[in-house]
């Protein structure tokens, strides 16, 4: 038994679902990239603070709209988010290690997500080509029928 070709409407619906998935994944990708930049900035700040004693300057925001002058009360220590609203005061080497692990995990997640987006984009392109071929075939078929009726 031969498989029936899906209708253009069914393919268009599938295309829209794929587009929605792509948009959703792009949103997640943007969030992960933002988190990665945040972790990288935190790691850089901890690394810079590791050798500081006394007063130092810290960025008040990522775009450097403000710079804060601060006195380190416990040089060589940093308070790091461990997850689930749990923070720990650690030496800067351990804090940097934890942040580096978070950075690596985010990079792996980003890579996996980018691969999934690539796969969805290829699927989208295949469905789009199929829809265009079906639409062109239907148009040619209708033109042929009109020509027969005109004869």
Swiss-Prot record:
Keywords: Chaperone, Cytoplasm. It comes from the Archaea. GO terms for cellular component: cytoplasm; prefoldin complex. One of its GO terms (molecular function) is unfolded protein binding. SUPFAM superfamilies: Prefoldin. One of its GO terms (biological process) is protein folding. It is found in: Cytoplasm. Heterohexamer of two alpha and four beta subunits. Molecular chaperone capable of stabilizing a range of proteins. Seems to fulfill an ATP-independent, HSP70-like function in archaeal de novo protein folding. Belongs to the prefoldin subunit alpha family. This is Prefoldin subunit alpha. It comes from Aeropyrum pernix (strain ATCC 700893 / DSM 11879 / JCM 9820 / NBRC 100138 / K1). The lineage of its organism: Archaea, Thermoproteota, Thermoprotei, Desulfurococcales, Desulfurococcaceae.
